[in-house]
A protein has these predicted regions:
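ATP-binding pocket architecture of kinase catalytic cores
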Residues: 1-104, 108, 115, 119, ...
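Regulatory N- and C-terminal appendages and interdomain linkers associated
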Residues: 9, 250, 254-289
């Protein structure tokens, strides 16, 4: 948890992040009552209308995704971030998703994929090349870590609140592991979802919407988006391999082809040639979805 900059489910973290998000004008649950030593809280109920569920029931997804992007943009425009966020359970530090944490996440791929695919053999030379390939990406991720990232921002952690307005229609939950990170982090979590297919044209529209709202350098942000998305997809594949191989949860195999599709596509983007060459050399096509 320390390397990954995780909160270990501490209720103080949830309460402090919730207060910060509400202060930024976003919809995070009100903390009605809190027992920090007991790890318990009574919080506002946003209902059951998860984005994934309402889209499945026929709600047009473009307005929902654009609202979710607006919520990200609102968070990114919320001003200077405190090193320690005050909250009803006490202060909680806003840690940086730095190069060590990013590399530690990526390393789950080389640690766990061979447990699931015995044909993979990552010896010392391969591991050294792995770290060298990702080093520019992790350095970039740390250097540009200047906004709060929800960190698990996807259609099953967002609740549709249609009676509210603008970005406040997006109810946020499961944000206790928020960190200081690159602005693209939550964007790729939302638009290259491990759990559901987001149409490429919707991904493109949503990214353009963010670029328009934030007035950023599109070329630089697209490059960073592909690089950090690729790293996170390698991490997620490692997590899924661990869930299957160690924890006996075979259902997670079903998510792996989607992650491979995203990763393979990102590896073809500019700036990832060294990482792509590593995968071409060390991971056979039969494993890569």
């Amino acid at each position: 948890n320390a390397v990954a900059r995780l909160s270990a489910g501490r209720i103080e973290a949830f309460a402090a992040v919730a207060e910060h998000l509400r202060g930024a004008g976003l919809s995070a649950p009100e903390i009605v009552a809190l027992d920090a030593p007991g790890g318990l809280a009574v919080i506002e109920d946003f209902g059951d209308d998860l984005f994934a569920r309402v889209i499945e029931n026929g709600e047009p997804q473009v307005p929902l995704y654009l609202a979710a992007v607006d919520a990200i943009a609102r968070l990114h425009m919320s001003g200077l971030l405190p090193e320690v966020m005050p909250g009803p359970g006490g202060g909680w530090p806003l840690l940086t998703y730095d190069a060590v944490a990013l590399q530690g996440g990526a390393d789950l791929f080389v640690q766990w994929m061979p447990k699931l695919f015995p044909e993979l053999d990552f010896g010392p030379a391969a591991l050294e090349a792995w770290h060298e390939a990702w080093a520019p990406v992790t350095a970039m991720g740390e250097q540009k870590a200047w906004v709060m990232a929800h960190r698990d921002y996807h259609a099953e952690n967002l609740i549709w609140l249609p009676d509210r307005t603008h970005h406040r229609r997006v109810g946020l939950i499961d944000f206790q592991d928020a960190v200081l990170a690159h602005p693209v982090w939550d964007l790729h979590s939302l638009l290259q979802d491990a759990r559901r297919d987001v149409p490429p044209e919707l991904e493109a529209v949503a990214l353009d919407h963010y670029f328009d709202v934030m007035m950023v350098d599109r070329e630089v942000y697209r490059r960073d988006y592909a690089a950090l998305a690729a790293l996170n997809e390698a991490r997620i594949l490692g997590v899924f391999a661990r869930l299957v191989a160690r924890d006996g949860k075979p259902r997670y195999r079903a998510f792996m082809p989607r992650m491979w599709a995203h990763l393979n596509a990102n590896l073809r983007k500019p700036g990832l040639e060294t990482v792509a060459a590593w995968f071409d050399r060390h991971v056979p096509a039969g494993v890569r979805g």
